[in-house]
């Protein structure tokens, strides 16, 4: 298989869309063919070799792309990818991993907003911070993340998991407002603190918060205190065990018969109830 190493030659101002450079695309291409792949930059089209130094190696296993000296101006990295691996050495722009179906993306830096948007499968690992709308839907759409795993080792912004229906989002830092808004399934785990309106208008799925919460919406029902719960999202679900002692809430009761589950750490929120 092929390993493609792209080294950004200099700082770019106008964003470049990287959705044409995918592991499954380059695995059967020659070096010259890769250099001539067209990318959209603003109102014009450029070639890969116009902004990158390009190196192609033979490796064992799945096809792999490494982007060195990366920039937040590089958008749509790994968009719709189905296999292989992409490693981003630096920051990634908006829509990294959007609609990805398989494979793995590792961002050794921060990611801009809409990381993993409408993600369907695969794994997205962000070792820095992420912007707003992690694992969310497109503007005006009601279909968010439907599979796969997103892990953010830093903080994330607002409205993570919007309209999420399946999969896992794990934020190891803090998050902003409206985490899990309109959530329809899947699990969101937040190790840090959460701002207001967590789980707003969720119908199903689960949100676990180990840090502090600013509030619980009045449309959620307190179900009691649970220890080391096993989260089951359906009758056939084997369950996901969660360590700790939690306040359990159900909701959001702005809907009829909601199945959403909130688990809020007792240790971090001793005065919540």
UniProtKB/Swiss-Prot annotation:
EC number: 1.2.7.12
Signal peptide: none
Pathway annotation from the record: One-carbon metabolism; methanogenesis from CO(2); 5,10-methenyl-5,6,7,8-tetrahydromethanopterin from CO(2): step 1/3
One Gene Ontology MF term: transition metal ion binding
GO-annotated biological processes: methanogenesis, from carbon dioxide
Top-rank lineage group of the source organism: Archaea
7 X 13 AA repeats of [GW]-X-X-[MQ]-X-X-G-X-[IL]-X-[IV]-X-G: annotated segments: 78-211
Catalytic activity: N-formylmethanofuran + 2 oxidized [2Fe-2S]-[ferredoxin] + H2O = methanofuran + 2 reduced [2Fe-2S]-[ferredoxin] + CO2 + H(+)
Keywords, in A-Z order: Methanogenesis, Oxidoreductase, Repeat
InterPro entries xrefs: FMH_DH_FwdC, Formylmethanofuran_DH_suC, Glu_synth_asu_C, Glu_synth_asu_C_sf
Intervals holding Sequence repeats: 78-90, 97-109, 116-128, 142-154, 161-173, 180-192, 199-211
A Pfam short name: GXGXG
Subunit text: This enzyme is composed of six subunits FwdA, FwdC, FwdD, FwdE, FwdF and FwdG.
Purpose of the protein: Catalyzes the reversible oxidation of CO(2) and methanofuran (MFR) to N-formylmethanofuran (CHO-MFR). This enzyme is oxygen-labile.
Family: Belongs to the FwdC/FmdC family.
Name listed for the protein in its UniProt record: Tungsten-containing formylmethanofuran dehydrogenase 2 subunit C
């Amino acid at each position: 298989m092929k390993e493609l190493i792209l080294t950004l030659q200099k700082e770019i101002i106008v964003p470049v869309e990287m959705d044409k450079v995918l592991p499954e695309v380059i695995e059967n291409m020659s070096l010259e063919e890769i250099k001539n792949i067209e990318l959209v930059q603003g109102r014009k089209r450029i070639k890969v070799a116009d902004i990158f130094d390009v190196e192609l190696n033979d490796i064992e296993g799945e096809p792999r792309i490494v982007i060195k000296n990366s920039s937040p101006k590089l958008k749509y990295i790994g968009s719709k990818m189905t296999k292989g691996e992409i490693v981003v050495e630096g920051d990634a722009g908006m829509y990294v991993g959007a609609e990805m179906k398989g494979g793995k993306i590792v961002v050794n830096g921060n990611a801009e907003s809409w990381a993993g948007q409408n993600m369907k499968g695969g794994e997205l690992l962000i070792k820095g911070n992420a912007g707003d709308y992690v694992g969310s839907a497109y503007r005006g759409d009601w279909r968010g993340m439907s599979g796969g795993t997103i892990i953010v080792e830093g903080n994330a912004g607002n409205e993570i998991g919007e309209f999420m229906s399946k999969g896992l989002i794990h934020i190891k830092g803090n998050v902003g407002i409206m985490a899990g808004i309109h959530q329809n399934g899947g699990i969101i785990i937040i190790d840090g603190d959460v701002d207001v309106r967590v789980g707003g208008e969720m119908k199903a799925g689960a949100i676990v918060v180990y840090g502090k919460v600013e509030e619980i919406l009045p449309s959620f029902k307190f179900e009691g205190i649970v220890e080391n719960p096993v989260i089951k999202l359906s009758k056939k679900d084997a369950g996901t065990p969660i360590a700790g002692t939690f306040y359990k809430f159900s909701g959001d009761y702005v809907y009829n018969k909601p199945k959403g589950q909130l688990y809020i750490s007792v240790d971090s929120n001793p005065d919540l109830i």
